[in-house]
């Protein structure tokens, strides 16, 4: 039987090919006692996010935030999935991510996502400030993302 690392790499390969279902199937082949390892759980989360399975992704992301509090991307995933899961909301996503600004002050994606949430909640002045913060940290990346991001449409319309 191939080692867990083989299945993990195969799952990541399927994900790169855009096939979240095959990636999840590959992860199921990992020995049950190793499936709870953070690396396997993180790969599972990536699959769930790619497959837009928000109801499953949100609690897994929350668990990974607790297990690996130093990993900023788990908080970003948790907020993103919490917004989109059944019964989820922008407010929930905002409440998850806002405190992370202090913990990860150099992470521009936190400011960017908060700007999106604020904009969607029609808190445009705050969204503008948050986007400016993200721009200070990342500049061109933020400009490219913000130009097409539907979440920021009302902020762009206001600027025109």
Which residues are covered by each model-predicted region?
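Alpha-helical junction/boundary sensor with strong preference for TPR arrays
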Residues: 34, 68, 104, 137-138
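"A position-specific structural signal for the A-helix of alpha-solenoid helical repeats
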Residues: 5, 9, 43, 77-79, ...
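Alpha-helical segment of the N-proximal tetratricopeptide repeat
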Residues: 2-33, 43
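Alpha-helical adaptor scaffolds
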Residues: 39-50, 59-109, 116
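Residue-level detector of the short coil/turn that links helix A to helix B
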Residues: 18, 52, 86-88, 122
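TPR/TPR-like alpha-solenoid helical repeat scaffolds
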Residues: 45-50, 79-85, 141-159
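TPR/TPR-like (Sel1-like) alpha-helical repeat modules
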Residues: 67, 119, 124-141
């Amino acid at each position: 039987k191939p080692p867990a690392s083989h299945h993990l790499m195969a799952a990541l390969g399927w994900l790169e090919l855009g096939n979240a279902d095959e990636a999840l199937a590959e992860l199921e082949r990992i020995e049950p006692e190793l499936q709870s390892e953070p690396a396997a759980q993180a790969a599972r989360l990536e699959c769930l996010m790619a497959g837009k399975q928000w109801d499953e992704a949100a609690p897994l992301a929350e668990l990974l935030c607790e297990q690996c509090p130093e990993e900023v991307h788990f908080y970003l995933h948790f907020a993103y999935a919490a917004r989109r899961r059944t019964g989820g909301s922008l407010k929930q996503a905002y409440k998850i991510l806002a405190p992370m600004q202090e913990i990860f002050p150099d992470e521009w994606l936190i400011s960017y996502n908060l700007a999106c949430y604020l904009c969607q909640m029609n808190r445009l002045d705050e969204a503008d400030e948050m986007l400016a913060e993200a721009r200070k940290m990342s500049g061109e990346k933020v400009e490219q993302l913000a130009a097409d991001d539907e979440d920021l449409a009302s902020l762009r319309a206001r600027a025109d």
